[in-house]
Structure formats: structure tokens, C-alpha cells
Amino acid sequence: FFDGDGLVYAVAFDNGELTFKHNFVGTKGFTDEQAAKQMLYKGAFAIGNPKGDAFYNPFDFDVKNVANTGVVDWGGELYALWEGGKPHKMDPTTLRTEGEADSVLGHDLEVPQMAAHYRVLDADDQTKKRLVAFSIEAQNAPLQANKCCFYEWDADGTPAARAPFGGQNATGGIFHHSLA
């Protein structure tokens, strides 16, 4: 259920006609599995061997980026998002995947995972909207510091602000109109 590959769809009205289009997000895992015609990688909630064999390494925590949690269309660009990996840039017209993104709307990602839960907030003067998102890299080792970076973009996609931070047990999130 939660491990399915991302599917992006668009519905539009054009001269009184309804159009519908969709496309799977062409992640590496998706394209590899389509070529092999079988599951090759675990998703975040899968257990065992994706091929169904009885033998597997229970300590292998690598999972594929399914790009199935969120989609952001902002400043003329379209991204498919998943909490545990890089966003995938897509063509907003054809919905074809252009590849993993190391930057989003002009902001280079401070860490490779871009959260899939962004917010659109009112700007200071209340006449414009701003997109707010963050990237985070949690460390599993007790003495390593977590890394996080918050980003803001104007309505046209221009980078407006960037705030990197980190530290022991540093976590954060966007709640309604607040940053915690």
C-alpha cells in the first residue's frame, strides 16, 4: 500500500473538454523493475526478500525511492517527492520524469532527502504566497549530528530564503504556519 511506485496524474479543462493524463515516476527502482519484469528492491515497509526467496539479509535497510508521497507544482516546475530520497523532476506538460534533482527551483539541496510535506504560506505582506519545504538527513549513530535545511520560494519559483542547521537530535517540521 505505502510501497507502491509514484503515479502522477493531471486533470484539466480545455475549451470545455476534460483531459486526463498520468505517468509513473521514472525512479531508478521503477525503471529497473520494469526492465526486469519483477520486483528487485524493497520499499520502506517491505520485509523479506523482494524476489520472494526465503533467504535475505534482515539487516539490509536499503529501500528504493518510490517518489509516491507528494507532488509540488510551483514556479513552472513539477517535482514528485518521497521522504527518504531526492525529489524527481518531471515535465509539467507530459509528466515524463527528467531525473533525480540535486536542486529544487534554484536551491541546491543541503542534504539528499527532501521532505514530501511542504506548505504554502502567506508572505509577509499577505498578497503573495510562499512555498516552504525542508530537507533532512537523520544520522543513526549516537554521536553524529543530524542535518536539516529549510527553504522558501516566491510564487514565481525564485529562491527567497534558506536556513541550514543541525545538531544532536535536531529534528523539525512545518506545522500550520509555524516552524518547530
Regions found by a protein language model. Name each.
Residues F1-A180:
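Beta-propeller domains
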